[in-house]
Every structure is written in structure tokens, then in C-alpha cells.
């Protein structure tokens, strides 16, 4: 896919001999990802699955906040809960939204639609191509 040479985001993940603690670096941040103790990790950071859900949850919350602010609706807080399930060989992600503020039922229905417009939602539900190579 030669036309996709300008990255939107770049992340590196590096792991040494410590099971399964992984150093994640972005342009401006670094943090740890790990696996739970039950599968051999030390639980020193979120698991890869939790990071994926965090991406969807934070993107959803940010998208909703931008929309709510543009509409000048009175909303004190937005909470997005995201859960991952594996059912019969398929992956299911459930996302629940809750709002603290003055919203009508119609506004809440609109916000459910807006949640589906967040870039990470679109990415996860759209066509994804992953190319793996060596450096």
C-alpha cells in the first residue's frame, strides 16, 4: 500500500526478557503494557486488549465532548464503559454511554449516533490492512 506513507500516528513497543512487560512509546508519551498474572505477566500496566478498549472509549468520549460543546448542551460529564467479549469465535465489543447533564431523549439518541462516528470506531468497523515487515 505505497500510497499510505504518511502515518497518522506512530507507536513503538519494546519488550525484553521480563514477561510480558512492554514499553510503549508515542511521540510524546511512554507507558507500560503487561499481561495479567494469571497468564504469566506481572500486571504492571493495561493489557493489549484493555489498551484497544481504552482507545475506543477515549475517542468516543472526546468525540462526544466536541459535539456537545459545539451544540452548547449542558453536560457535566460523559462516561463510556467498554467491554470485550469473545463469543463463538467472534469478537464483540459493547459500549455503554452515560451522561451527567441536561439532555432530552432525542439528544441522547443523537449522541449514540455520534459515538459511532468517532475515528477509532470507524477504524475498527472498517477495512483494516496490517502489513508486517522487518527493519
Where in the sequence are the language-model features?
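Extended beta-strand/beta-hairpin segments
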Residues: 1-53, 65-135
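Alpha-helical metal-binding/catalytic segments enriched in His/Glu/Asp
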Residues: 56-60
